[in-house]
């Protein structure tokens, strides 16, 4: 009995020591500390996933493979064979590229549990702002040559570099000076905003499916484990309060339903990744989760963001803000006498921007400025892409290492 107890105690100590060793190995596995080992595990995980996917498709996806092959062959023939259909095929391809581009940007924005690319700030937001400013400047919204005439990969919209005279005289001018109303601008950028929102909803599915699979197998997904084991003392002020809110959401998981998921998806917040994990962990039906996420992100949230940017860039809101600011300053002692001169200068600057023709510098100067701006912008995008790639590679390698460690731990426990 005594020897058995000693053996059991030494076995527990060995398992505990191995578990601590495994945790340290996972923590230290990053591209900065162990680049070769991290890349090796990432490649192993990728190959394993591809093999598993191919095996599954060969075993269960006979009809899927057949239909996909037929569609690819038909599409290839339509694209390569010349004929009267060529123009229509090219138009369809433009719409496909346009749709895939904005959906992919949405997926990239939301995938990776908060570590994704901020594509709204990089692409959709600037696109809406530039279109609004151009429409306000030209006094009309018929700027696009087609719905897909937007910012895309290696492509600038045709309307961006055109002067207002090329579109014709302004069509929307009112006595108040608000040239283009919100209701006219919104439909022009609405489709790409909704497509981006659909992409963000699709990007929330992997955490749900991973958590759902973990729940069915009886285990807990990484995000839930980290939340359970996280301490509020080792974080900053914001992280501490965010963890408290997450814990509150975790303890009130019985309230998760269509409406609560819809509310969480509709408002920009850092809690939705956790909500997706919890919905999978606690068995919320897929369609209930996905439809609430889709409506919240693709309809409500994107419209809130789009309308906000249009209002900020629209002349109407600027006029309202100017009037409110003047009213506030008029009540400040000493500033009331300065207001007429300040207002006149503001109006002169605004009229100069809106009504004066844009200066035409020399061809060389334009090229230099474009090159400089493009270089800075591309540098920012590439830095964010690099950061995104590093996070994905590290997370995949760490997950693969954890699976290996679990097998090692299971072998050790069974051998005892």
From Swiss-Prot:
Subcellular location: Endoplasmic reticulum membrane
Gene Ontology terms: cellular component: endoplasmic reticulum; endoplasmic reticulum membrane
Keywords annotated in UniProt: Acetylation, Endoplasmic reticulum, ER-Golgi transport, Membrane, Transmembrane, Transmembrane helix, Transport
Primary residence: endoplasmic reticulum
Sequence ranges on the Cytoplasmic membrane side: 2-60, 125-257, 313-323, 394-416
Lineage top rank: taxon: Eukaryota
N-acetylglycine modification, residue list: 2
GO aspect biological process, one term: endomembrane system organization
Membrane topology (UniProt): Multi-pass membrane protein
Spans within the Lumenal topological domain: 82-101, 279-289, 345-372
Signal peptide: none
TM regions (residue ranges): 61-81, 102-124, 258-278, 290-312, 324-344, 373-393
Function text: Involved in the early secretory pathway. Required for the correct export of secretory products from the endoplasmic reticulum (ER) and involved in the maintenance of ER integrity.
Family: Belongs to the VMP1 family.
Protein name: Vacuole membrane protein KMS1
């Amino acid at each position: 009995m005594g020897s058995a107890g000693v053996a059991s105690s030494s076995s527990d100590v060995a398992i505990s020591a191995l578990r601590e060793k495994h945790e340290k190995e996972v923590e230290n596995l990053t591209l900065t500390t162990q680049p070769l080992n991290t890349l090796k595990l990432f490649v192993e995980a990728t190959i394993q996933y591809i093999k598993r996917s191919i095996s599954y498709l060969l075993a269960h996806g006979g009809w899927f493979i057949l239909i996909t092959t037929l569609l690819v062959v038909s599409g290839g023939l339509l694209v390569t064979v010349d004929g009267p259909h060529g123009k229509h095929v090219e138009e369809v391809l433009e719409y496909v590229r346009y749709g895939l581009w904005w959906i992919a940007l949405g997926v990239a924005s939301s995938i990776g549990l908060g570590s994704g690319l901020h594509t709204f700030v990089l692409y959709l937001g600037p696109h809406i702002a530039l279109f609004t400013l151009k429409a306000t400047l030209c006094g009309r919204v018929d700027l696009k040559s087609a719905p897909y005439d937007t910012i895309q990969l290696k492509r600038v919209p045709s309307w961006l570099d055109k002067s207002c005279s090329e579109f014709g005289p302004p069509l929307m001018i009112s006595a108040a000076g608000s040239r283009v109303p919100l209701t006219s601008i919104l439909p022009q950028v609405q489709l790409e905003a909704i497509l981006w929102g659909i992409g963000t909803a699709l990007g929330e599915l992997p955490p749900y499916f991973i958590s759902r699979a973990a729940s069915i197998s009886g285990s807990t997904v990484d995000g839930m484990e980290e939340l359970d084991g996280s301490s509020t003392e080792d974080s900053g002020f914001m992280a501490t309060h965010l963890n408290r809110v997450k814990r509150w959401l975790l303890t009130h998981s019985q309230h998760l339903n269509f409406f609560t998921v819809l509310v969480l998806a509709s408002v920009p917040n850092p809690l939705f990744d956790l909500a997706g994990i919890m919905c999978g962990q606690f068995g919320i039906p897929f369609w209930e989760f996905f439809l609430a996420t889709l409506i919240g992100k693709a309809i409500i949230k994107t419209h809130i963001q789009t309308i906000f940017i249009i209002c900020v860039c629209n002349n109407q809101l600027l006029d309202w803000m100017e009037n409110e600011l003047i009213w506030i300053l008029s009540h400040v002692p000493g500033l009331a006498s300065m207001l007429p001169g300040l207002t006149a200068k503001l109006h002169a600057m605004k009229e100069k921007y809106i009504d004066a023709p844009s200066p035409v510098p020399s061809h060389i100067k334009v090229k230099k400025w474009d090159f400089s701006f493009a270089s800075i912008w591309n540098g920012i995008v590439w830095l964010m892409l690099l950061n995104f790639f590093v996070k994905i590679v590290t997370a995949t390698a760490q997950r693969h290492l954890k699976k290996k460690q679990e097998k090692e731990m299971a072998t050790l426990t069974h051998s005892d």
